Amino acid sequence: ETTGLADPAPVLHSVMSEPTLLARCRLEGVITVVDAVNGMATLDSHAEAVKQVAVADRIVLTKVDLLTGREGEDMLFAIIARLRKLNPAARLLTTHRNEATAERLFTMGLFDPTKKTPDVRKWLAAEAYETGEKRNRRRHAHHDENGHDHHHHDDVSRHDEHIRSFSFTETQAI
């Protein structure tokens, strides 16, 4: 799970290629949530939102009940049309009238990138390439600086300089 606007390609690549995760996890699918009221503006302003919709197996449309009257119907039609254009294969559910049940959300089978659009396959391939390149640079980044013989490791986080991320591995249950 990512929170807010995150590029799904690095997360998917990690889950599908990291040996530790492969041994412990099985990726069944991707669910993304789209706000029916603000979704168009979000898709217009954030490439990550477009990617989230494009890779999803399930799209959950929230706040549908707030779209009332003729204007609301037009907004709902427009956001649904946009989502269908970005990802015609995803199952679209709303939170209205209990449509997004656990069974509908989580019964989807294994994630299969070969069944995704060419853009999604391209994003995943680019992530695999970038991850491999960074790994190769880290393996070879060794030098003597200021009398200290050590390795430098690139920050593989692709955020700006104000956002940092890290991970750690435990061998026992926490």
Residue ranges, per PLM feature:
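Phosphate/Mg2+-binding loops and adjacent switch elements
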Residues: 2-102
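C-terminal accessory "lid"/substrate-recognition subdomains
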Residues: 51, 58, 66-174
